[in-house]
């Protein structure tokens, strides 16, 4: 099971997450309490292992700005958390992830229309897109096609206590966590370690 730790804002957390086995790290460039500057993201990314995916999170940003930040920071993928469509995705010409809030099985069916490398299923948006710590009904994704499952990233309210049930129900390609590995709004490296251990155990 692949694991993504999202909302990275400092070097120490990034390095520790990689040491514990994270397969991907997320850097939020949209409005969020976890927002990071491109300059700091670049410093962190330069120190990370080559095999770890570096994913930039954007919300309704222009194609030009996304391309510039991707190139300058050394991102491997972009995660689109807003109202982006296939036209914008094609113009980006960057490996991409489309994030969708899930309220019914219709959302799962609509996801198949997006021409992205991965689909991230998350809780419905609130004030900020993503990272709100709330789960949705995983059963809504239990019967997706094998083709969609192989490109599915599961997010939304995940933590070390519920990750086993989430993986067993959805069987995604990757799981994504942010607030579920935080203590008082800050990344907690011990929680990151335990989350990764639990998630990896599920795929043995």
From Swiss-Prot:
GO molecular function: phosphoribosylanthranilate isomerase activity
Pathway: Amino-acid biosynthesis; L-tryptophan biosynthesis; L-tryptophan from chorismate: step 3/5
EC number: 5.3.1.24
InterPro entries assigned: Aldolase_TIM, PRAI_dom, RibuloseP-bd_barrel, TrpF_fam
Catalytic activity: N-(5-phospho-beta-D-ribosyl)anthranilate = 1-(2-carboxyphenylamino)-1-deoxy-D-ribulose 5-phosphate
Record-linked SUPFAM superfamilies: Ribulose-phoshate binding barrel
Key words, A-Z: Amino-acid biosynthesis, Aromatic amino acid biosynthesis, Isomerase, Tryptophan biosynthesis
Keyword Ribosomal protein: no
Segments passing through the bilayer: none
Homology family: Belongs to the TrpF family.
Stored PANTHER family: N-(5'-PHOSPHORIBOSYL)ANTHRANILATE ISOMERASE
Protein's UniProt name: N-(5'-phosphoribosyl)anthranilate isomerase
């Amino acid at each position: 099971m692949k694991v993504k730790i999202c909302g990275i804002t400092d070097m120490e957390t990034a390095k520790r997450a990689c040491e514990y086995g994270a397969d991907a790290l997320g850097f939020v460039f949209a409005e969020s309490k976890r927002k990071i500057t491109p300059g700091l993201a670049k410093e962190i990314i330069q120190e990370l292992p080559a095999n770890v995916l570096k994913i930039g999170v954007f919300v309704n940003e222009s194609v030009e700005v996304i391309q510039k930040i991707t190139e300058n920071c050394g991102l491997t993928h972009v995660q689109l958390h807003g109202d982006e469509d296939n036209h914008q995705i094609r113009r980006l010409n960057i490996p991409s992830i489309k994030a969708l809030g899930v309220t019914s099985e219709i959302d799962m069916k609509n996801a198949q229309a997006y021409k992205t490398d991965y689909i991230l299923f998350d809780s419905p948006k609130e004030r900020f897109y993503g990272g709100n710590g709330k789960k949705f009904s995983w059963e809504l994704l239990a019967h997706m096609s094998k083709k969609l499952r192989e490109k599915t990233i599961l997010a939304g309210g995940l933590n070390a206590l519920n990750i086993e049930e989430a993986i067993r129900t959805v069987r995604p390609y990757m799981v994504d966590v942010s607030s579920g590995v935080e203590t008082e709004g800050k990344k907690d490296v011990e929680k990151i370690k335990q989350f990764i251990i639990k998630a990896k155990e599920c795929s043995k």
